[in-house]
């Protein structure tokens, strides 16, 4: 039998209404989460729903915190994690001097794994739980990202960059191989866990 996890805190979320969403705030709220599935099964004012549960175990009271849904970033490039805020007088200069140099490192599986883990840890630290990210033209950059995401049970959307021009030769791939790699990635990762 599944146990629940209980979190008492201020809680903010939105509920769907006719034609939109309405913000809901509980100054002293209770969030009830199924420990097996990780799904929220109840939320409300502590005084309204707290007596309906056995709070003798798996109970955490955050007196100075706010619980809210994770943030979603709809456009990010995880391979550019280490070159964020690098200066370039123009986009092309920035790509040539920083981005393409960094992305070539993702041909190494260990490096791709390392950056995927650093990137995801940074997202979580800042409250972002879902992203839509570009990877690199290397298939292993996508595998590294999805492996790290799956271990954290995060919902992610990602894919392999298909690039056959205007970049260093090491980053370019031909259309046929890129297509085959993309099909393989889709077959391996699509709908796997939260991916």
For the regions a language model picked out, list residue spans one by one.
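Active-site gating/metal-coordination segments in enzymes
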Residues: 96-100, 104, 121-125, 129-130, ...
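Hydrophobic faces of well-ordered beta-strands that scaffold small-molecule active sites
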Residues: 70-74, 131-133, 156-160, 195
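Metal-coordinating catalytic core of metallo-dependent amide/deamination hydrolases
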Residues: 140-195
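A short, small-residue-rich loop immediately preceding and capping a beta-strand
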Residues: 107, 129-138
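N-terminal metal-binding scaffold of metallo-dependent hydrolase/deaminase domains
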Residues: 1-53
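Active-site gating loops and adjacent loop-to-helix segments of metal-dependent hydrolytic enzymes
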Residues: 84-112, 165-175
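Divalent metal-coordination and catalytic microenvironments
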Residues: 31, 38, 64, 75, ...
């Amino acid at each position: 039998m599944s146990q629940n996890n209980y979190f008492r805190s201020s809680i903010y979320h939105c509920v769907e209404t006719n034609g939109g969403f309405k913000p809901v705030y509980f100054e002293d709220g209770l969030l009830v989460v199924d420990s097996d599935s990780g799904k929220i099964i109840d939320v409300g004012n502590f005084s309204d729903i707290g007596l309906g549960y056995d709070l003798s175990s798996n109970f955490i009271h955050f007196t100075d915190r706010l619980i809210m849904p994770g943030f979603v970033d709809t456009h990010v490039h995880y391979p550019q994690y280490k070159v964020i805020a690098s200066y370039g007088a123009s986009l092309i200069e920035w790509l040539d001097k920083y981005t393409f140099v960094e992305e070539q490192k993702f041909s190494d599986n260990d490096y791709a794994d390392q950056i995927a883990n650093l990137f995801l840890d940074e997202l979580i630290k800042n409250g972002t739980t879902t992203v839509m990210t570009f990877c690199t033209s290397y298939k292993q950059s996508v595998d590294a990202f999805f492996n790290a995401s799956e271990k954290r049970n995060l919902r992610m959307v990602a894919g392999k960059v298909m690039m056959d021009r205007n970049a260093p030769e090491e980053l370019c791939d031909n259309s046929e191989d890129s297509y085959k790699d993309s099909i393989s990635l889709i077959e391996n990762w699509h709908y796997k866990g939260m991916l």
